[in-house]
Amino acid sequence: MFGSPKRAALAAASLLAVFGNGPSVMAQETSSNNAVVADGKTFALNGENVSYRFRVNETTGDLVSDHFGGSITGNLFPGFGAEALGGWVGLAGRFRREFPDHGRGDFRIPAVRIRQEAGYTVTDLQYQSYSVIPGKPALPGLPSTFGSEEDVTTLVVHLYDNYSSIAVDLSYSIFPKYDAIVRSANVTNKGTQNITVEALSSFSFDFPYEDLEMISLRGDWAREAHRQRRKVEYGLQGFGSSTGFSSHLHNPFLAIVHPSTTESQGEAWGFNLVYTGSFSVDVEKGSQGLTRALLGFNPSQLSWQLGAGETLTSPECVSVYSSDGIGGMSRSFHRLYRNHLIKSKFATSDRPPLLNSWEGLYFDYNESTIYRLAEESAALGVKLFVMDDGWFGDKYPRVSDNAGLGDWVPNPDRFPDGLTPLVEDVTKLKAGNSSTDLRFGLWVEPEMANPNSTLYHEHPDWVLHAGQYPRTLQRNQLVLNLALPEVQDYIIDEITNILNSSAISYVKWDFNRAMHETPSPSNDHEYILGMYRVFDTLTTRFPDVLWEGCASGGGRFDPGVLEYFPQIWTSDNTDALMRITIQLGTSLAYPPSAMGAHLSAVPNAQTGRTIPVKFRGHVAMMGGSFGLELDPAELQEDEKAEVPGLIALAEKVNPIILTGDMWRLRLPEESNWPAVLFISEDGNQAVLFYFQLGPNVNHATPWLRLQGLDPKATYSVDGNGSYSGATLMNMGLQYKFESDYDSKVVFLQKQ
């Protein structure tokens, strides 16, 4: 016990021996851009507005965290952490640890847990050396951010357990322009006996003692990305996915903020795991008040055996720091992802307005009805026509969700001569009154198989299954095991054949169920690695195809998918009122340029709500990929007359949405008048989306203050007057709305 002053003093002395009394003076081994400064004892990563510092205790080799926040220079004030020792917490649990291992007196959740052949899970990872790399190496088999030597510098810190011969490399890549630090870790078995990695975090950080709050995105099918903000309490709290994919339920995103932090003011730390599989986000406030945040693999679905010489690499985690509130955090994510994550040529290219056949026809179509829908789409000004589910399956035709998945050949009853004649006819159509040819796109769900399919009858062993346990169906389908190379090759070959057969310029890649009955805990990660191989092969082979990800809506809206697919269907819920919440929630981490958003028919298929077409269109065009989800023949005449103008407006705002900065001025959960401002990359143009949700009877309408403008510049507002940026930001503007579900799109031009 530490009851007596003498024992407390002895304990304090021993604790200081382990972790040191404070940072030592930094030597000057510096990267060319000053982004990384290291001397083997202290380490500093420097961005335009961020500093990240940690050090090595020279006695024990432990890494100790010092700072992650606003820019600092010079020596650090010598802090302390060993005063209050009158408790039972192990000594290591009282300090801020950079990469906490397991079993040595730190009883908080560890960043790594490894079971050795003898059964114990103790590790003693000590600092060995470091290296600084200009640029950023790619992660083997995993999506990762990228950049040139001018964009990013990487620090790798090498740790080693002398008792078990386990090596861990910690990678820190700093993008100074974005105040972003990207981290990952790998574990290598340097010994002769097998080890099993049971937990591995990509990112770990211990915040100092202070009151903090955490923000996450929760939801379910058709109500993804609902913002949740709560106090960080003492003890363990967190969330994750065990579905085998990132999921609708929780997103692999976390923000840590102060209670006073708002959209535009205060500090915010954002974390986003670049991974599409099951994950875990853990936040623990320990007994000393230190808050630990970890993001990485879900330990319940990780049991990864490493033989001698083998390595397990974690996904990477992007962390950003903002002193400009939650909005500043989001804009850092957006800029980084547009420029250094999404590899597609379409990352910042104008996206064609499209019409998807799903909500217009569902499964009920043939070649003539599809062509009729394409004709009517072109007449409205649509430039891309997408044929959704229902076009494939020969022996088991896909006329419902009960059959056909896995058999990627055109349904001979619907398309007797294959897809080529249809594609040729559709791509001869002109978009509206222009000379632009209509493009053709296709829906696929290659990771699935129906039991009613030729594929399943020939290869029942290709689906996920656990011995003799029943194979649980969801949506009448099973999941192909992409951990198997032969399954990966089959999917690559089938999709290649389809894309080579006709002029298909767009693919919507869907995924409509969770993973059950996996054969082993490691299969989940093996599946994701196989999926990434498929994505990488196909997107590299067909770089001119615009790929869109989907998983029953936003079930796989994560950075891992974004590397390969520049846009993702945000939600199967196309109700415009709910979409405002979903899209603004998604924008906490993900750029609007990546969001698919469609104007659909009313009453809405998901909610039954009827909302004016203008409001529906304005909400949809806040996404980078604007489209229609309806049958034009079913539109009322007044609605049909408005649609071409909405398409033209969407095309006008699209370049600003794709490359500009987003400012969430008001949130739908906080105001009857949510508003979003997009400002072009050069600052010369801006577009304001302004909504009234409910009626406002006999009551004033609030003024709306803009943000992000140049206070000294003058702006033309919709061509009807000129106002200074200072006036628009400090006084604001005011509009009258006529009714509920009214909306306005306002253009600003810098003069």
Curated annotation (Swiss-Prot):
Its EC number is 3.2.1.22. Its cofactor is Mg(2+); NAD(+). Residues 1-27 form the signal peptide. The active site is at D510, D572. Its main location: secreted. One of its GO terms (molecular function) is alpha-galactosidase activity. Keywords: Carbohydrate metabolism, Glycoprotein, Glycosidase, Hydrolase, Magnesium, NAD, Polysaccharide degradation, Secreted, Signal. Belongs to the glycosyl hydrolase 36 family. Homotetramer. This is Probable alpha-galactosidase C. The gene is aglC.
